[in-house]
Amino acid sequence: MLMFQKPKGTRDFLPEEMKKRKVIEKKLRKVFDSYNFSEINTPTFESFELLSKKTGDEIRTQLFVFKDHGNREMGLRPELTSSVARFYINEFKNTPKPVKLYYFTNCFRYENPQAGRYREFWQMGSELIGSKKPIADAEVINMAIDGLKEINMDFEINIGHLGVLKGVFEKYDLSDDEGTEIRRLIDKEDMEGLKTVLSRIESEKNIEISKKVFEVLELKGGREVISKLKEKLAEFESSVEALENLDSILEFVPHEYIINFGIARGLDYYTGMVFEIYGKREGARQVCGGGRYDNLIELFEGEPSPAVGFAYGFDRIMLNIDDFQVEEEAIFVVPVKSSDMLLNECFKIAKTLRDAGKSVELDLMGRKLNKALNYANNKGIKKVLIVGENDISEGKVALKNMETGEQSLIELNDILTI
């Protein structure tokens, strides 16, 4: 048995997996950049006070918490929204609005590892701060969708609005705690628990709320759902306003979606539109979640600032995309035999190619030619430059295609074209 193993809930990524992750990361970055979002990063750890501000001390058991040498309580970040809110207040509060930021980084949660759920995981997400216009919500939704289209992932997006149920709760004079309890049961899809809680509230308040709640939850579909629900909730003014806000947002979303008011999102700071995106992989279906949170900056003692954003679960995206091979683009440069003169020529050729931005590997083991070619073949390197005395004296080098076995002489002046 090996003495040291990786910590529970973490992973080592082999070179082939890292290449695939980099390909997907690059494509997602391309989409974020196309919307002119600017990349930032924040510390890996923050004060525990900051990390627990949204949820309270009960989150402690879900985090990696420690004290520094100054006896200050710190925690590894479980997500980026709190850190970005702090960063915004520290650095961007006087910047012209909207402020459009994105990030790609690792996060940490102390939870039981299972399929698609790790103690160290990667998130890629965005925050758009400063605009409360419906088109800002649509911008974020469209960017999340475009990213997954860019990587050719099959997915389904569900969009809802917390204001619809909130309007029902207000009409029946439910407390904030009662509304939060109902929303958390909806988020967990615990319908039996929901029925029990609603029944208890009905008995205590002598009201009939269950029917309206389930009417909202059960009505799903395209944009026509909004008009149907407006009829059913005509006397619920706040709910109708939320439906009209959602309709204004969807005016700018040209992609297919499912309206679903059963999206409650586990975090309590969401205030309006919410959405979730699902892949096809069982056990790792939800790959993205987001929405509007207009009170978050204020919660962290900043000026009231409307905000909307989302985060991809990058590891879940990797589980949901079809396996693919990354083409090996490196060029292997090897002398036909061991010789200081030929090694020097190989070094100069490698430097010329590297200076032009190409990936080049030199034979560093002093192998005989056949073994060097076997090494290149095992690594999946498709192009090998073989440097021989006679060829180099004529300003040429041999190019071997490892896929076809074909070999030809090319001019040294032409090596940048291979």
UniProtKB/Swiss-Prot annotation:
PROSITE patterns: AA_TRNA_LIGASE_II
Entry-linked Gene3D superfamilies: Anticodon-binding domain, Bira Bifunctional Protein, Domain 2
Keyword entries, A-Z: Aminoacyl-tRNA synthetase, ATP-binding, Cytoplasm, Ligase, Nucleotide-binding, Protein biosynthesis
Keyword Cytoplasm: yes
One Pfam family this sequence matches: tRNA-synt_His
GO cellular component: a single term: cytoplasm
Catalysed conversion reaction: tRNA(His) + L-histidine + ATP = L-histidyl-tRNA(His) + AMP + diphosphate + H(+)
EC number(s) reported in the record: 6.1.1.21
A biological process term (GO) from this entry: L-histidine biosynthetic process
GO molecular function: ATP binding; histidine-tRNA ligase activity
InterPro entries: aa-tRNA-synth_II, aa-tRNA-synth_II/BPL/LPL, Anticodon-bd, Anticodon-bd_dom_sf, His-tRNA-ligase, HisRS-like_core, HisRS/HisZ, HisRS_anticodon
Compartments it resides in: Cytoplasm
PANTHER family: HISTIDINE--TRNA LIGASE, MITOCHONDRIAL-RELATED (PTHR43707:SF1), HISTIDYL-TRNA SYNTHETASE (PTHR43707)
HAMAP family in UniProt: His_tRNA_synth, HisZ
Similarity-based family: Belongs to the class-II aminoacyl-tRNA synthetase family.
NCBIfam families (UniProt xref): hisS (TIGR00442), hisZ_biosyn_reg (TIGR00443)
Protein name: Histidine--tRNA ligase
Organism expressing this protein natively: Methanococcus maripaludis (strain C5 / ATCC BAA-1333)
Lineage, highest ranks first: Archaea, Methanobacteriati, Methanobacteriota, Methanomada group, Methanococci
Gene: hisS
